[in-house]
Amino acid sequence: GHDLIVSQANNPGVLIKQIKRTQSAEDLKLLRDRLTDIIQSSIHKNIPLFHIYNIASEINLALIKRSVELAILDLGSPPARFAWLCIGSQGRKEQLLLTDQDSILVFEDVVPDKYRDVKDYFLKLAKRSTSNLEKIGYSLCPNGHLGSNTLWCKSLSDWTNQYNSWMNTPGKNSNDLSSIFFDYEMAFGESKIEEAIENVIYKNAKSNTLFFDFLGNDALRNNAPLSFFKKFIIEEEGPNKDKFDIKTRALLPLIDSARLFALSYGIKGVNNTYSRFKQLAIADPRNAEIYINCAEAFLTLSKFRTIEGLKNEDSGQFINLNELNKLDKERLKNALAPMRELEELIKDKFQLTQFS
């Protein structure tokens, strides 16, 4: 009987039902801790990572949605329709470890004399929601990419202007133009608003050389993972000395490249790195092999990072190579191989010559 109770406790469907009924952020935290158990036991059982991503993403979304609902219960019903979008890793459904919360809030356009009151309400809502999320364990984003930041809580028209200026004059706005704003998933609200944002992005992306130049250079800016002699390039100093930065040197280049190509091929509705590469293999069959290798490499690398993060209760960004056996080191090295070809493909497709 005991095993059954434990497996019920860690059943994703049951967990989501409980989240929907929860009355406080403190209780949500207990349910978030169970998600970590689910992730750990799934990895232990060797369940495919892509499947684990989907389960975790559903549970994370339910937690975020409930955090916003609890804030609404406190504040009273919203004066206008809105959408709460997760951006970054949760927007890509790639959040397994507790990382920062990244979000934006988009509310529908209202008549000018109502604007201030409406915006006031949504700023309050965003503050409450993010503080609920903080209680659950999602730390506030260090870059301030949060709906509760005045910059990231605005009307649909203001967001439209924001994306227009980011995408049409990327150089001018490079300080706050973060590519994570192109990875989004709605946690709460009006799907029409999310569609409107998506349409703005894809309209601006059409044959926008300047924008792809910017994103392309951005994707190529990360440091190589292996030296010329195929040795891992490790941290030379600081608290992570001698460790391998799997996030910056391996995962980010794949995440950035998948986004870059997906936007340039107009692939809509797919914000996940693995799925983006699979879709690209269909959109650009001539280079299908490269994309499929990258999709698989992404999962392999992500699994290394997740295991490291669960072991150390951190973000898993730095891999201690001395703790890997020979076989794992080989697997890690092989997963870095497709990046070379991908880099050539980017330079070729976007004719990148100058590196900003």
Where are these regions (language model features)?
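Glycine- and acidic
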Residues: 42-53, 106-116, 237-243, 285-286, ...
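Catalytic metal-binding acidic patch
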Residues: 92-120
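Conserved catalytic core of two-metal-ion nucleotidyltransferases
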Residues: 31-43, 53-66, 74-81, 115-181, ...
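… and, occasionally, acidic/histidine-rich disordered N-termini of signaling adaptors
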Residues: 76-90, 98
